[in-house]
């Protein structure tokens, strides 16, 4: 086993080199000349090894150093071992960087590494999507030149990173940006897309505002009549009118609460529990009778039902979806409208549809029809007792059955609501 170079080895090498000079000098004389020749030969040998080492270090790409003898052998062997260790460390460091980048790419947030001045030296893929960065084209670019927002510039310049920055991109996307010091004079920037959270917060505010608004009017009516009764007793027709109005408003509030509870129940229901066998044809026969009663012969109906077509699902949710679509057609179409209800087999499953030849719905309203409390004609909806929750209930109910609500409408020609229950949920004995 080779050991490191020592003084003993160097002195021994020098003595061995000079030994022939001593022997020859003892026999022939001229000892100084023989010693000079020996030392010169040793020097030339060292210079030759130095040139070989320099060639290997600067020119030769081989990992193995040139073979060495004497004092050069442990030196060259040590250099070779050091190179192997460095290669191993570089490989380990490369693997560590790969794991770090792989982990950073898996993060659900955009990650950017910059210098203290803002020069980018790395970013993950999500940063390219969310912040619009390009890698490696933007390497070395100042992030303030790429994200030109005054509040972002001020946030970086003040150096107060105790709170995140909420930034709005292009009036649509909301970002939450956090900046943390990262090693010496470097910054770690994490950007999270919180657009959906802002939308949910807005929906929550609108929901409570709408519920408050819907309850305020019937409560105001009830309060008004109660105050009238306190001031003077009501008799005859006035009393009957007051009781009738209070009863209507109470029923309206009760209906609103029931629909809110139904919507909450559907949203909270587990989607995987679709194991009930639902007799949709029988359900539609009940809905047909109720629709005829609700219509009071103002509309005409055609029910085209495949009596053998049954599905697996949640019966309460499907009943809510089907009845809401049919009752909406009755409540929101004028007298003389013809309503066609179909339950039939289609190539990809079982389709339920409600079609009418009424006035239709303007295109700008269609994307918002399934929002809670959204109404196309608010005055007419309140007159018919509509709460604006029916289509929201339908949307969530059909989503739980791996489907989606389709709405097609042409102004002046009519509207068609439909959804398709997928093939896998059709009962096996359905033809």
Swiss-Prot record:
Its BP terms in the Gene Ontology are: cellular response to phosphate starvation; phosphate ion transport; regulation of DNA-templated transcription
Q: Where in the cell is it found?
A: Cell inner membrane
Cystine pairs: none
The molecular function terms of the Gene Ontology recorded here are: ATP binding; phosphoprotein phosphatase activity; phosphorelay sensor kinase activity
What's the EC number here?
A: 2.7.13.3
InterPro entries in UniProt: 2-comp_sensor_kinase, HATPase_C_sf, His_kinase_dom, HisK_dim/P_dom, HisK_dim/P_sf, PAS, PAS-like_dom_sf, PAS_fold
**Reactions the enzyme catalyzes:** ATP + protein L-histidine = ADP + protein N-phospho-L-histidine
User: How does the UniProt record describe the way this protein sits in the membrane?
Assistant: Multi-pass membrane protein
Chief localisation class: membrane
Keyword terms: ATP-binding, Cell inner membrane, Cell membrane, Kinase, Membrane, Nucleotide-binding, Phosphate transport, Phosphoprotein, Transferase, Transmembrane, Transmembrane helix, Transport, Two-component regulatory system
Q: Membrane-crossing residues? A: 14-34, 39-59
One Gene Ontology CC term in the entry: plasma membrane
- Could you tell me which residue ranges the Histidine kinase domain spans? 210-425
Using the UniProt record, name the top-level EC class of this enzyme in a single word: transferase
Q: Does the keyword Ubl conjugation apply?
A: no
- Which ranges sit in the Periplasmic compartment? 35-38
The PAS domain sits at 96-167
Q: Using the record's annotations, give every residue carrying the modification Phosphohistidine.
A: 213
Cytoplasmic face: residue ranges?
1-13, 60-431
Q: Which PROSITE patterns match?
A: HIS_KIN, PAS
Role summary: Member of the two-component regulatory system PhoR/PhoB involved in the phosphate regulon genes expression. PhoR may function as a membrane-associated protein kinase that phosphorylates PhoB in response to environmental signals.
Give the protein's recorded name.
Answer: Phosphate regulon sensor protein PhoR
Q: Which organism is it from?
A: Shigella dysenteriae
């Amino acid at each position: 086993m080779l050991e490191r170079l020592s003084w003993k080895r160097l002195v021994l090498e020098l003595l061995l080199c000079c030994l022939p000079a001593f022997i020859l000098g003892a026999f022939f004389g001229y000892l100084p000349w023989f010693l000079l020749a020996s030392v010169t030969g040793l020097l030339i040998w060292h210079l030759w090894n130095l040139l070989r080492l320099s060639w290997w270090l600067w020119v030769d790409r081989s990992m193995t150093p040139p073979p060495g003898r004497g004092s050069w052998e442990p030196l060259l062997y040590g250099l070779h071992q050091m190179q192997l260790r460095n290669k191993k460390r570089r490989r380990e460091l490369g693997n560590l960087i790969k794991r770090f980048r792989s982990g950073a790419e898996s993060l659900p947030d955009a990650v950017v590494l910059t210098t203290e001045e803002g020069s980018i030296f790395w970013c993950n893929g999500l940063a390219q999507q969310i912040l619009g960065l390009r890698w490696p084209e933007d390497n070395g670019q100042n992030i303030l030149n790429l994200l030109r927002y005054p509040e972002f510039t001020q946030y970086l310049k003040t150096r107060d990173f105790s709170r995140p920055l909420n930034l709005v991109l292009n009036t649509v996307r909301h970002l939450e940006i956090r900046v943390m010091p990262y090693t010496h004079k470097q910054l770690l920037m994490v950007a999270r897309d919180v657009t959906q959270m802002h939308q949910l917060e807005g929906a929550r505010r609108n929901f409570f505002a709408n519920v408050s608004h819907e309850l305020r009017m019937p409560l105001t009516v009830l309060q008004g009549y109660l105050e009238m009764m306190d001031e003077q007793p009501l008799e005859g027709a006035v009393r009957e009118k007051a009781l009738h109005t209070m009863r209507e408003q109470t029923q309206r509030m009760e209906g609103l609460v029931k629909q809110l509870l139904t919507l909450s129940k559907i949203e909270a229901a587990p989607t995987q529990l679709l194991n009930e066998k639902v007799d949709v044809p029988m359900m539609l026969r009940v809905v047909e009778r109720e629709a005829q009663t609700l219509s009071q012969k103002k509309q005409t109906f055609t029910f085209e039902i495949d009596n053998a077509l049954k599905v697996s699902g949640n019966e309460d949710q499907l009943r809510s979806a089907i009845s809401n679509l049919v009752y909406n057609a009755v409540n929101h179409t004028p007298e003389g409208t013809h309503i066609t209800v179909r339950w039939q087999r289609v190539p990809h499953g079982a389709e339920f549809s409600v079609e009418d030849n009424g006035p239709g719905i303007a295109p700008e309203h269609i994307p918002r029809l399934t929002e809670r409390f959204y109404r196309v004609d608010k005055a007419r909806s309140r007159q018919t007792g509509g709460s604006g929750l029916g289509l929201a209930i339908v949307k969530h109910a059909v989503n739980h059955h791996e489907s989606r609500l389709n709405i097609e409408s042409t102004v002046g020609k009519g509207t068609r609501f439909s959804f398709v229950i997928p093939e896998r949920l059709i009962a096996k004995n359905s033809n």
